[in-house]
Amino acid sequence: ERPDVELWVLCRPEAAYFLWRLGKRQPKQEGQLRSDVCAVAAFFAHCGAKNAAILGCTGSALPAAVKASGVRALTCICPDRATARLIENKVSGTRAYEGSSGYTDLADASQSTVLMYLPVKAEKTERLESDLRNALFETRRVLEPEGRIVVIAALHHAESTLRKTQGVRVLGRYPLTLSGQKSAIWVMETTPVNDEA
């Protein structure tokens, strides 16, 4: 028979330490990615000593993980100026600026990897789907041939759009739960549009 939690806290000497550790956790901002998800996404990105970009960057955890993977140059396109400043201050050697994920100042075929994060708490709207389509179009423009795309998003936000996108081939889809919603990490690579089936 298992004792209830209150009895365990009263009786066990390690309970005080457990409660102290529980209270010490930093509350995450809404829409922030967990560090383990960021590490997995950075691993799938296979950046190496090349250039990478993050579209729709809302926090510093993903840029820090990608930078730690040994990327040469990292560019983050953020939805607001405050996030861009935060990333530049926390992740050294990273270029971050406010802008649209669908229209960047990156040169054609200049990136080996592009990562995208769609916050899972956002409501699915026509605008969200349109923004994702524009971001994927921009991604194909800035990626070098056979470049890699990593998308982190809720299934209901991105699955149908990613399936219909031309010029990319899905290498793998890895399910996970983010903020209580079914989500996934999609790993894709660019292909010539005429090679598609």
Question: What would you call each of these model-derived segments?
Answer:
Residues E1-K28:
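Non-catalytic substrate-recognition/targeting regions of SAM-dependent transferases
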Residues G48-T58:
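Conserved class I S-adenosyl-L-methionine
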Residues G59-R72:
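Conserved SAM-binding loop of SAM-dependent methyltransferases across substrates and taxa
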Residues A73-C78:
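Conserved SAM-binding motif I beta-strand of class I
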Residues S92-S101:
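Conserved SAM-binding strand-loop segment of SAM-dependent methyltransferases
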Residues G102-L115:
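A short acidic, Gly/Pro-enriched loop at the edge of an enzyme's catalytic core
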Residues D131-P145:
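A short glycine-rich, Lys/Arg-flanked "PGG" loop and its adjoining helix->strand segment in the class I
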Residues R148-A197:
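C-terminal catalytic and target-recognition region of SAM-dependent MTase-like enzymes
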